[in-house]
Amino acid sequence: MNKILEKYLYIVPEAYYEYNGKQYMQSVHGKSYIRYNKAKEQAGYATVDVDMVIKYIKEFLNEIGISTIENPIFNPQKLDYSRIKAEFDLEDERDLVWIKFTKDGYVGVVATSNDVNFDIPQSSHEYDRKHNVYNPYSKEYEETWLHNSSGILVHKLGKEWNMDFVLIFPLKNIPKGYKRADIEEAVGNLLIEKRVPILDYYSHLY
């Protein structure tokens, strides 16, 4: 057991709700407002400098035994996941934690995997729109939301993504018994404890 990592593996209050005895993730769709209200609350706090966010995460990753990148600032237009995998000797090119920011300096989301994006709706009419996407694992088309939660929340707040950079932390040597989703959860909770505002506040828990 990694005691330092375990300290940050917990579910933030209100991340889930219960209905008919079952637990569900909070939504950004329909008449669900928990995540939007939380985003609005977070947007009322002062931003934290990118350099400080980097410092917090690098210190934490080193403490749990993950030696990561010296400078995690990447140009999103030039991302090559296979190259990152080879350079940092990752077991899987999805072994990444990444963070994107809004133009006014807020952390938009803490995420994992090889899917950095700056998705955002063009209008509120698109919030609840769905489309069919091919799943290469099931080899079937699946109906899914057109836009992701962080994009919807950022659009609702009247903000825009900063597409000039993204933070990417390659996760080499993930502690035994844990997976990249655990590191994502821990990093999100760490930043919350450090009072770093996160607009898509619950996303790292899903």
Give the positions of each predicted feature.
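Short linear recognition/processing motifs and adjacent strand/loop elements at protein termini
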Residues: V110-T112
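Boundary/linker segments flanking structured domains
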Residues: M1-V97, F101-Y106, D115-Y206
